[in-house]
Structures are given as structure tokens and as C-alpha cells.
Amino acid sequence: VRSRGLGDVYKRQIGGNTCNGVTSADSASTLHAWEALVELTGVNGKRYLPIKDFYIKAGTVDINVAEGEIQTAILIPKASWENTKGFYIKYGMRNAMEIATTGCSVNVRLSADKKTFDRVRIAYGVAGPVPMRAPSAEAVVNGQPVTMENIEAFSRAVLEDINPRDSWRASKAFRSHIAVESAKRCLIESVKLAGGVL
């Protein structure tokens, strides 16, 4: 995996970004939006966890170190990515080597005529103690026409699901504002990538 505009120009593997369990990891929200599976391998073989179950609490993931488990793969099911386009926005104080103040990932599958939201998924980093989806926002647009009015309603609905914190990086109110704005921008860009017209 190589970042472009998200951080530094170093090449890296994705496991370190997930195994540390922090909600601010750049890959965390995107892997949640794509409904990824985590493959864990240990002395007793392999097991697979949905990414939403992998993150237990802030800074803690479900790896059994006593059994020598390590993360060996991230899998994204074909049904999650087929005919689907997505976009990620990271908000931080700097352009490089920065921990996200908020990270938002949206992906969309449009109807064949590109006029209806067939499926929309949105996930956040730094909107709660673990990366999280915003199912209320998803429900607002799934099955609905691709319109700016629906995109605006989608972006406002994220506030029903997220619970950002106050910190020295940003206040809860500011993080909430960024979450709404990034939801809107991510969905607009995802629609464009999927061939939709606004």
C-alpha cells in the first residue's frame, strides 16, 4: 500500500495500521466501509473476523498473543467491492505524517442507469472509541434517487451515529462539523467515480 497525499511517501504494509487498534489509522474507516475481514493465524490455525469485531476498544484489537496469533491478511469480499467506487477524506492539521483529526470513507454502488443509490456505506475514524459505520446515514440514501438533497440529508444523518470526543486536536463540535462536511464530499466524489451525475 502506498499513500498519496495522506501522509509520507514511504511504502508500508497494512497490518501495522490495523493491529495497533487506534481509531485514527488511515485504513480503519476504509476497511470498515468495505466490510473487510481480518485473517489471524496462530498455533491453532486460522480464524477470520469481520473488521467491525476486530476492534474491541480504543487501542485494543482481538489478537490472541498467547496463542502466537498474528494478522496475516485483510480480505475484502467481492460482493463488497464489485461495481462499487469509493472516496476517503482525512482531515488533519498538517498534510504529512499526521494523525487524523477525522477520517471519513464512503463507497457507493449505483443502479444500472446511475440514477439511484443501490448501496452506500460510510465509516469514520476518530468519531468514537473505535472505527465505526453510520447506518442511519446509509439508510437515508439506500434505494433513493441520486440528488443533492439526498446527499445533504445523508451527511446530516451521520450525527445520529457518531460520538467524537473533545481533545487538544479538535473539539467535539468541530469534529462533528468536519464529519458532516466530509460525508457530503466523499459521497459526491464516490458518485462521480461511479459514473453518476449530480
What residue spans do the PLM features occupy?
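C-terminal structural segment of proteins
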Residues: R4-L198
